[in-house]
Amino acid sequence: MPIYFPATYSTLSSSALASWLEAQYFFADVRCRLLVMGVGDTYLAETATGRYILRVYRPSHRSREQIIAEIELLLAAKEAGVSVSYPIADRNGQHLHPFSAVEGERHAVVFSYAPGNPVSILNETQLRILGWEIARFHNVSSTVRLNGSRWTFDPETTLLRPLERVKPYFEDLPEEYDWWQQAAAKTITHLAQADGSRFSAGFCQFDFLPKNFHFDGDALTLFDFDFFGYGWLVNDLMTVRVHLDLDVHFGRLTREAAGQAFDSLLAAYREIRPLSDDEVAAVPWLSLGFWCFYMGFHSTHDVFHPLVQASQLKARTALIRKLLPHL
């Protein structure tokens, strides 16, 4: 029996996964190819009856219980009529599949395919559709009960812990790291003054950038809930604002157009569920947590290590300071 050298990460064979899909699911003529490496490796499976997404999670980043919670959330959203990419059961009614890989047990889930394409600059109709769909998702995510394995989005998890995690990477950038610390302290102080007990809470997707939803005409599908956790639901609207701010910075939108776009999204959202002015006022402050949280994640994942090198961190800090001038 061969003895393999220990590994922390392996990439599963696309052809072997295609054969597995044919045996495990009611799929025929499966062609499988790797799309992207991330927290989970994402494969496109093309079959005789349609396309599907296969995600193989990394055990270092997602536990079995955390993946089960994601499955439960998406099935609840689908049951409620929310347009999401949802888990597909196999011949035996199972959604979660263990694989014995070199680094240990990995888990895989097959998802429905999100038709259409990402749209970077949304028109008025698309903005309203997105606002409605996020609100419908929040109607589910604010009431669903899961297994307790997911994390919470709060100042500790979005600011303090990520900053501590990336501190070694800022060793040669003391001024930049000082700015992050001061900005985090200012944000925490400001948010503490808000009456957060009156903010709607539930499970947040925390990454509603255009790369995570597709439009096919006026039909919208939300996907990639891998980072979802519990927190103020306005965090999800904040992530849309983050993208609009980037559009302004890179000259794709004027500041006035970005403001109008966000107002359209909020108006549509409020047609489905309430949203207070205080929650909206928190958006610029919550934005720092978005950038800090994902910066911390980049330091934990080898694929993203180039993003935490000194040159990248210096450029990223300069960008965030321009995007968030109130800090």
Model-derived regions: residue spans:
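Juxta-kinase regulatory segment immediately upstream of eukaryotic protein kinase catalytic domains
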Residues: 1-31
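A cross-family kinase active-site recognition segment
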Residues: 120-178, 201, 311
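ATP/Mg2+ or Mg2+-diphosphate-binding catalytic cores
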Residues: 3, 293-327
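ATP-binding pocket architecture of kinase catalytic cores
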Residues: 47-146
